[in-house]
């Protein structure tokens, strides 16, 4: 098949249970639509939760995730099976840049959007460079020890935000604990797709419990469904205009480094599952993701990234057809044009969102450790040990550096600190040949 241009998508006659469906193959229309629904559901939990945590409109973010996925599909020539959803990497820096308190709509959303656009631009430029010279320089700049440390630092940096969001009252704190337990029980005691959707299912169960305890038993603030009943079934989401603030852009733009590392890992995972070489499309994937992030930020949506949740669905179903993600994108766009759906999202109690964020932020931190384990990172080397130790404290302590009028927050200092310390302290192990033994004749 040609390196660039769209494949022909040969019809796969076997069922999804008995055979693998390759990226350049397709299922019958009905099965493609059903698989699209499954992928839309898989991305739903995080794509809704992340914009809420940043004070963005989740309805618009869902719409832009669908549009971004279609843009990614066209830029990669329909060769890379991936779904683009709201990225957790933006949460900490957006909150730091805007001073968002975690409740309702972010009043400083405009400067956050300018930063998201700047991040997408940096990401796109990196993709263009990769298209020219390949990815080896990225792997040298950000080896697994660096990416693992930065990802873990992001999770630790977000931890105080999650805890503070559920500390308003004793009832909120206990409901957050109940939410954590709901998600944990789903993760451990369910199987198949329900287990894959642990965040979404856990949120639904926790919301039902919250409704019973407040609306029925009167133990807390009741859930108000007035907005849901008055909202229209179809309509435009709320768009916002970006503002370009230098300090916010400097704070948010470095997230591009995290997105590159994340996308790189996801593409390698997809390549391993499909048996296809994804390296020729890596630069295009970065460009597609970067442009989708810029487009989303330009109208009020969150930054996007390829989703591990959907990679997990592919691993289970063995269906890698890229047309499935077109179906998922169309479904997401339809949901994004439903104000009633958006109003329903806004009824999720803050305590439940806070409990879910405790789990999500913890999983982000653990994902960093998983990178180390999967790549057999040697933390007994002093260079690696010092780099990781400093990076984690910079991120967890939200260490900031100010230069002139610009301030680099904890995630930014952790990211650049990890890259710089790795470059300074890493050393290649050189095999020293054993001394030559000279045998003298007696």
UniProtKB/Swiss-Prot annotation:
PROSITE patterns: XANTH_URACIL_PERMASE. It is found in: Cell inner membrane. GO terms for cellular component: plasma membrane. Keywords: Cell inner membrane, Cell membrane, Membrane, Symport, Transmembrane, Transmembrane helix, Transport. Its main location: membrane. GO terms for biological process: pyrimidine nucleobase transmembrane transport; uracil catabolic process; uracil import across plasma membrane. GO terms for molecular function: pyrimidine nucleobase transmembrane transporter activity; pyrimidine nucleotide transmembrane transporter activity; uracil transmembrane transporter activity; uracil:monoatomic cation symporter activity. Residues 79, 132-140, 191-196, 262-284, 340-347 are periplasmic. Pfam families: Xan_ur_permease. Residues 1-57, 101-110, 162-169, 218-240, 306-318, 369-385, 428-442 are cytoplasmic. It is a multi-pass membrane protein. It comes from the Bacteria. The keyword Transmembrane applies. Disruption phenotype: Cells lacking this gene fail to grow on the nucleobase uracil as the sole nitrogen source but use the nucleoside uridine normally. The chain crosses the membrane at residues 58-78, 80-100, 111-131, 141-161, 170-190, 197-217, 241-261, 285-305, 319-339, 348-368, 386-406, 407-427. Induction: Up-regulated by the nitrogen regulatory protein C (NtrC also called GlnG) and repressed by RutR. May function as a proton-driven pyrimidine uptake system. Belongs to the nucleobase:cation symporter-2 (NCS2) (TC 2.A.40) family. The Rut pathway degrades exogenous pyrimidines as the sole nitrogen source at room temperature but not at 37 degrees Celsius, a restriction that is apparently a consequence of an inadequate ability to remove toxic malonic semialdehyde at the higher temperature (RutE/YdfG function). This is Putative pyrimidine permease RutG. It comes from Escherichia coli (strain K12).
């Amino acid at each position: 098949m040609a390196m660039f241009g769209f494949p022909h998508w040969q019809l796969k006659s076997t069922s999804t249970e008995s055979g693998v469906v390759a990226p350049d193959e397709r299922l019958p229309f009905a099965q493609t639509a059903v698989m699209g629904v499954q992928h839309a559901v898989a991305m739903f939990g995080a794509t809704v939760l992340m914009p809420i945590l940043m004070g963005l409109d989740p309805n618009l973010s869902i719409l832009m995730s669908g549009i971004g996925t279609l843009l990614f599909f066209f830029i990669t020539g329909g060769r890379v099976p991936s779904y683009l959803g709201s990225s957790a990497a933006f949460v900490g820096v957006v909150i730091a840049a805007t001073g968002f308190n975690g409740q309702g709509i972010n009043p400083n959303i405009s400067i956050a959007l300018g930063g998201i656009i700047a991040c997408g631009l940096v990401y796109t430029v990196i993709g263009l460079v990769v298209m020219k010279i390949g990815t080896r320089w990225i792997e040298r700049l950000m080896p697994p020890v660096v990416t693992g440390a930065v990802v873990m630092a992001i999770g630790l940096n977000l931890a105080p935000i999650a805890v503070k969001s559920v500390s308003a009252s004793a009832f909120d704190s206990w409901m957050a604990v109940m939410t954590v337990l709901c998600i944990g029980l789903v993760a451990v005691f369910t199987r198949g797709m329900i287990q894959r959707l642990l965040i979404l299912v856990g949120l639904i169960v926790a919301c039902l419990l919250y409704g019973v305890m407040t609306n029925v038993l009167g133990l807390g603030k009741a859930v108000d469904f007035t907005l849901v009943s008055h909202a229209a079934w179809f309509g435009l989401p709320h768009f916002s205009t970006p503002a370009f603030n230098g300090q916010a852009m400097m704070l948010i733009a470095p997230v591009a480094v995290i997105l590159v590392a994340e996308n790189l890992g996801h593409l390698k995972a997809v390549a391993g599952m499909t048996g296809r070489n994804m390296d020729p499309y890596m630069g295009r994937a970065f460009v597609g993701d970067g442009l989708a992030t810029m487009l989303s930020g330009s109208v009020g949506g969150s930054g996007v990234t390829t989703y591990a949740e959907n990679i997990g669905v592919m691993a289970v179903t063995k269906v890698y057809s890229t047309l499935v993600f077109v179906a998922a994108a169309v479904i997401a766009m339809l949901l994004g044009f439903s104000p009633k759906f958006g109003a329903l999202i806004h009824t999720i109690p803050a305590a439940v969102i806070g409990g879910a964020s405790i789990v999500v932020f913890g999983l982000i931190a653990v994902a960093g450790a998983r990178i180390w384990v999967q790549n057999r990172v040697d933390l007994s080397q002093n260079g690696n040990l010092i780099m990781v130790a400093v990076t984690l404290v910079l991120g967890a302590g939200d260490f900031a550096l100010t230069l002139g009028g610009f301030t680099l927050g904890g995630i930014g200092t952790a990211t650049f600190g990890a890259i710089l310390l790795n470059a300074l302290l890493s050393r290649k192990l050189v095999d020293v040949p054993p001394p030559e033994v000279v045998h003298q004749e007696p």
